[in-house]
């Protein structure tokens, strides 16, 4: 059987992009694939505004697949529907030169540093957790003047590494 990786939301009924759906050789690592037929994706770079990553921003979905609104919740609808058929996903992403969509974070999880740069903590936390010495990592700077990183060490791995280095644990 075939298995496809894709991206979509309930509000976009649900497919926006998928890897491999348009035939062999149409999958690309680190992306969720090509945008589906009849759907258009644009990237709102004003939502991110990071000079180091100017091609990233909020993923905006355009198409007949976009919901009309949230049932009995006009306020929430106004926050995400720009105009009929145009939806703010709340996800950060980028399109490469061939039209493959990559998801890079969430708009609401980002925060601004004192130097004006925006940070999406999830990729940094995931990189820290690649170390066998780190059990969990949380990066936060929302509503703060400083950014804080809390690391929960993997004590078993830490003791083994110290022993291998000749340090008495």
Tell me what each language-model feature is.
Residues 41, 99, 128, 149:
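Residue-level signal for inorganic ion chemistry
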Residues 10, 118, 132-136, 157-169:
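Conserved C-terminal helical docking segment of ANL/AMP-forming enzymes
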Residues 8, 33, 91:
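Active-site glycine-centered loops adjacent to acidic/histidine catalytic or metal-binding residues
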Residues 90-92, 131-155:
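C-terminal boundary motif of the adenylate-forming
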Residues 122-128:
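Short amphipathic alpha-helix segments
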Residues 28-35, 81-84:
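Short Gly/Pro-enriched turn/cap motifs at secondary-structure boundaries
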């Amino acid at each position: 059987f075939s298995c496809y990786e894709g991206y979509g939301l309930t509000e976009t009924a649900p497919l926006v992009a998928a890897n491999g759906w348009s035939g062999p050789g149409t999958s690309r690592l680190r992306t969720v694939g090509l945008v589906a037929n009849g759907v258009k994706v644009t990237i709102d770079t004003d939502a991110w505004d990071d000079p180091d990553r100017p091609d990233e921003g909020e993923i905006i979905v355009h198409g007949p697949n976009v919901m009309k609104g949230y049932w009995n919740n006009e306020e929430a609808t106004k926050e995400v529907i720009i105009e009929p058929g145009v939806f703010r996903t709340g996800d950060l992403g980028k399109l490469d030169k061939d039209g493959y969509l990559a998801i890079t974070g969430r708009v609401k999880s980002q925060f601004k540093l004192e130097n004006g740069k925006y940070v999406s903590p999830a990729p940094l936390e995931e990189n820290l957790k690649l170390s066998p010495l780190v059990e969990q990592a949380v990066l936060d700077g929302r509503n703060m003047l400083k950014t804080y990183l809390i690391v929960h060490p993997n004590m078993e791995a830490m003791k083994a590494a110290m022993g291998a280095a000749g340090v008495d644990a």
